[in-house]
Amino acid sequence: MVINFISIDSTVHYGIKCLPTDIFAEIEEKLYKKYDNLRNTNNLFTCSEKPVLRFKKLCENNIKDGDILQMYKMNK
């Protein structure tokens, strides 16, 4: 499963599952408006590149394309 992540700060991330780039950009812009500080610290990466992240209170089987997920970093 591919998740595109947007980093809000060092602990909270929003992930969007398996989206075409144009739709992802649209949702990304909405998150930018909600979190102005994102503009300067935007960090996009995939699940495989950041294995320290996991889903917060979500069952992977229930995630649909386009869902926006709140993420957090696991303690090492």
Across the structure, where does each feature detected by a protein language model lie?
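Ubiquitin system architectures
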Residues: 1-76
